[in-house]
Amino acid sequence: MASLSSKSALVSRLLQVKKESGKTYTEIAKLTGLTNAYVAQLFRRQAHLKPETASALKAAVPALSDDLLAAMQEIPMRSFDPTVVQDPTIYRLHEATVHYGESIKDIINEEFGDGIMSAIGYYCSVEKVKGKEGEDRVVIIMNGKFLPHVEQVN
């Protein structure tokens, strides 16, 4: 397993290659058939690049070396630096989850029963839309499989 410092170095290299490509996550997503959030997860080593997707990613970002593509295909250590929560955007996402969390849970339970929304088999995307007054608005779509809690019997 790679150390967190080597993960950090790899992520820095991947983000530099992405920056040099001049492409956004959304542009890369359109070229690869992935969501923009998943592409960002790949470059941040929070997701595993499937071998069958590697060629599309290489075509979208030609400067990705074979070594970088191979590293992206290793199963990642899905972790985060605890100080990342101090970033205002991430903090506001956390704040929204805390503020709406119990209400969202209640609605999930009413609509589906006793269970959770999985982050496995999960799709996420971020979209930019115009609001009613012409202002830019952020739409985050979180699409997770419902997993019912099961009764544990012998």
UniProtKB/Swiss-Prot annotation:
Broad EC category: lyase
Keyword Lyase: yes
SMART domains: Cyanate_lyase
GO molecular function, one term: DNA binding
Residues annotated as the enzyme's active site: 92, 95, 118
Pfam families assigned: Cyanate_lyase
UniProt keywords, alphabetically: Lyase
Catalytic activity: cyanate + hydrogencarbonate + 3 H(+) = NH4(+) + 2 CO2
InterPro entries, sorted: Cyanase (IPR008076), Cyanate_lyase_C (IPR003712), Cyanate_lyase_C_sf (IPR036581), Lambda_DNA-bd_dom_sf (IPR010982)
EC number: 4.2.1.104
Lyase among keywords: yes
Domain of life of the organism encoding this protein: Eukaryota
Protein's GO biological process: cyanate metabolic process
Assigned protein family: Belongs to the cyanase family.
Function text: Catalyzes the reaction of cyanate with bicarbonate to produce ammonia and carbon dioxide.
Protein name: Cyanate hydratase
Native organism: Physcomitrium patens (Spreading-leaved earth moss)
